[in-house]
Amino acid sequence: MTPVTGTALADDHRHEPIGNPRQEMITMLDPDVRRALDGTSIAHLASVLPDGAPHCVPVWVGTHGDHVVIFTGPGTRKARNLRRDPRVALSLTPADNPFQPVVVRGRVIGWLEGDAAWTIVDRLATKYTGQPYPRGDERVVAVIEPERQRVGVG
């Protein structure tokens, strides 16, 4: 899949239906969802294994425009899962309000690599640890377009 750039994502307001055409596409992150994603709570990312079983792992998460971003190594199980089947679910519980969990479902619409990826990787690492991410291993960023989002138990 061709990497997408931050500029292209921020400037592209075209959205085509994915899946059920009657399902309303979400083009903007809810402000409460954005606030939670931009906080320091660890998210849990669910993807689909080759046999159809769920795969859930903790991840650092953030926003990039109206998209959700996570990073990983290009050969990790989650990267392989998401490249094969782009459907994803994320959940997190904000530490300051554990009774308002956040759930986002969507699809990976692109991958950032190289300098574009490292800009986001460093931003997330600094948010969570106060320091840029150590160099050495390659990192890629999955860009997720939210299709459904929810705040609170329901």
Region locations from a protein language model:
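Charged, gly/pro-rich active-site loop segments
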Residues: T2-M28, N97-G154
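Short, conserved active-site entrance elements at the starts or edges of catalytic domains
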Residues: H15-L49
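Catalytic cores of transferase enzymes with a strong primary signal for eukaryotic protein kinases
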Residues: P31-V33, H67, A117
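A generic structural signal for nonpolar/aromatic side chains embedded in well-ordered alpha-helices
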Residues: A36-L37, L82, L124, I144
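Short beta-strand segments
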Residues: T40-P74, R80, L90-L92, V103
